[in-house]
């Protein structure tokens, strides 16, 4: 499978690329503003992608692929231009290039606007809300939106809860495994999926989505 990872030098994106690189059957295109930071691997092709560019330029830079995993974010620095508008431009480019599978890394509560004011991440959630809404209502992509709880840098347990929240955190390791599993198993299409650390092995949890 040919998979594009957007945000390939971020915490989650880098983890996704590293895991995919271990599967010789996958051809990975790792997109980032600074592709030189992406570790070399036989089946990983880094490419430059700046979400501040025009949509046509983003489209021209996108390789031919079967799926996109979108993990990019501005870290709160440029929410409208990157987390919202940048994401929408990638969706538009994907449609024009007929890359129909699109897995979006979002956040818990991104589609619950009545709760935004109570969150310390209010502005981030607003940006994610409109990006997610665009993906659902303004594209024909085979999307999946993953809504994990807080991301933590610890070794993944390999066990999760999908479709509900059982804890307040997720290891980045587990999130990367779920994103990959959603793509490789064609699971959760046209679904918004809640995620937290849990008790079910990731392959089993993903299989139950089909």
Where is each model-derived feature located?
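N-terminal Rossmann NAD(P)H-binding glycine-rich loop of SDR-like oxidoreductase domains
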Residues: 3-23
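Non-catalytic, hydrophobic alpha-helical segments
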Residues: 12, 68, 146, 175-179, ...
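Conserved Rossmann-fold NAD(P)-dependent oxidoreductase catalytic core, especially the SDR/UDP-sugar
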Residues: 29, 34-35, 76, 82-133, ...
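NAD(P)H-binding glycine-rich loop region in Rossmannoid oxidoreductase-like domains
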Residues: 33-89, 93-96, 183-187
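Substrate-positioning beta->alpha
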Residues: 86, 167-181, 191
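SDR active-site lid
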Residues: 117-118, 122, 126, 150-173
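Glycine/proline-rich active-site loop of Rossmann-fold NAD(P)-dependent oxidoreductases
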Residues: 154-160, 182-191
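Short-chain dehydrogenase/reductase
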Residues: 192-200
